[in-house]
Amino acid sequence: MKNILFVFFIFQCLIISAATNERHVHIHFKVTNGFGEVTNFIIREIYENGKIDTVQAIEANHILDLPVNHKILLEIICPHHVTRRIAINTAVPDDLEYIPFYELFFDLIETDVVNLQPNRDEILELLLFPVGYVTYNFEHNSWDNTLSEFTKTINKLLKKNFK
């Protein structure tokens, strides 16, 4: 009986160690709004194959581990705020030993503030788009937002509308 339990224990350890050897991209992010840090929000991971995973975050600062070699749409969902999105392509070279983390900042907009604007439909339509598309830059060994100019344009339009 002891031998069977020992073999079962070793088998479980091998399964756990195999699962922890998967490579991940570490996303460090902070979620704020006009009043400070946002707590108790949901992060929805939508994978290119249709798989959806949901994580509840208690604090504004959160770390998310995403598997490599996937295209993922992240949605930050919080009650009384407009949902924000960002697309991430986690493809990295197979021989890369250390995968650098990516730091992300989300500034959520309260739905009450948007509803007070005369052009609220245009603002909501702007906010439907992902704020960026993050990919790994092989030359610089870092992560880049390949839509940074688009992101800057959206942010300028939003600031202009909320003045």
List where the protein language model places each region:
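Short, ordered, surface-exposed loop/turn motifs in non-cytosolic proteins
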Residues: V25, G34-E48, V131
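Short Pro-Gly-centered beta-turn/loop motif in secreted/extracellular proteins
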Residues: I63-L73, P79
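Bacterial Sec-dependent N-terminal signal peptides
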Residues: M1-H28
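A short, amphipathic beta-strand motif
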Residues: R23-F35, A60-H62
